[in-house]
Regions:
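FIC/Doc superfamily catalytic core
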Residues: 1-311
Length: 311
């Protein structure tokens, strides 16, 4: 009944109690944009050709690790390029090469700690031709390194937003690493601290988070939790242009809490799948079929085990 009401736009939530500090209309609208994408994650980045590189990226990381275990040396960047660039005369190669540089130039840093403001600076500097700067900073000329290591936004508001985001990124929480990576990523997209291309930088930051923690894909958690955020999403959307910012910000908080809970539950389900894998492997060994355990990785990588079909 709730889903039907939400689909018809007739669902009604209780009136907001307070604003709890979320007063920035631009931030809230950015959150809503991300929420709409998350509610159908398979198509969230469908308009961005770079999304096609995500799966090959993770595959190349795994392939490189396997080759190194065999004592062979391989350049991860060249391996990745060979996977996604079949035609080296492609006019988009400059953008793709910058995108890959942004990933691999920051990969070592990401592996050694959380994503920080310095990581953002490193990623932005991989696209000097795009004129990316901090939001509300004076516009600078293109074709130059825009953000030096000690650069910080001129705007005090943007400084505060970034400082809070970095603190959240560094906090050790009782969350699955994937959950924390996703929420940190959502937080960055919400504040959108750059004057342009926040979406592209956000995608790269997410990939760095996943690479640093050896996480393969964000899809399972969000697919499993998709239905649980629909109610809150419609509640906010219905009131977006009808209420003052301070009135509907509690709905955003409600949605974010619901999303966090949904992802946490999905993380628990993924953990149970890992336990099932270990139990299955132990059982096969116990009954004398240890050789069959070699097939388990293939079985457990089936989409039914990784997306939303268990929900």
């Amino acid at each position: 009944e709730i889903r039907r009401a939400a689909a018809q736009g007739t669902i009604s939530l209780p009136p907001p109690a307070n604003s709890e500090g979320l007063e920035d209309l631009a931030v809230l609208k950015s959150c809503l944009k991300v929420i709409r994408e998350l509610s159908g994650f398979r198509y969230a980045f469908a308009k961005d050709a770079m999304a096609e590189t995500f799966a090959p990226l993770m595959a190349s990381v795994e392939a490189k690790n396997e080759l190194e275990r065999q004592g062979l040396k391989v350049s991860l960047k060249s391996y990745f390029l060979s996977l996604i660039l079949k035609d080296l005369e492609n006019p988009d190669i400059l953008l793709i090469d910058n995108y890959i540089n942004a990933l691999f130039n920051s990969a070592n840093e990401a592996a050694n700690g959380p994503i920080t403001v310095q990581t953002v600076v490193n990623v932005v500097n991989s696209f000097p031709q795009d004129g990316i700067n901090w939001r509300e900073n004076p516009q600078t000329d293109e074709e130059q390194i825009l953000l030096q290591p000690d650069t910080f936004p001129d705007s005090k508001a943007v400084q505060v937003e970034l400082a809070r985001w970095e603190k959240y990124s560094k906090e050790l929480r009782d969350l699955d690493p994937l959950v924390h990576a996703l929420l940190t990523n959502l937080y960055f997209m919400a504040i959108s601290p750059l004057n342009r291309h926040n979406g592209r930088v956000t995608q790269i930051l997410l990939q760095l988070s996943l690479m640093g923690q050896n996480i393969n894909s964000p899809a399972p958690c969000l697919m499993l939790g998709r239905a649980l955020i629909t109610n809150a999403h419609f509640g906010i959307e219905e009131r977006l242009y009808g209420l003052r910012t301070r009135q509907w910000s509690p709905y955003l908080q409600y949605m974010l809490k619901t999303l966090s809970k949904a992802i946490l539950l999905s993380g628990e389900l993924l953990a149970s799948l890992q336990r099932l894998y270990a139990q299955t492997e132990a059982y096969l060994k116990m009954i004398g079929l240890a050789s069959h355990a070699a097939f388990l990785p293939v079985i457990f990588k089936h989409p039914a085990c990784r997306t939303g079909e268990f929900s």
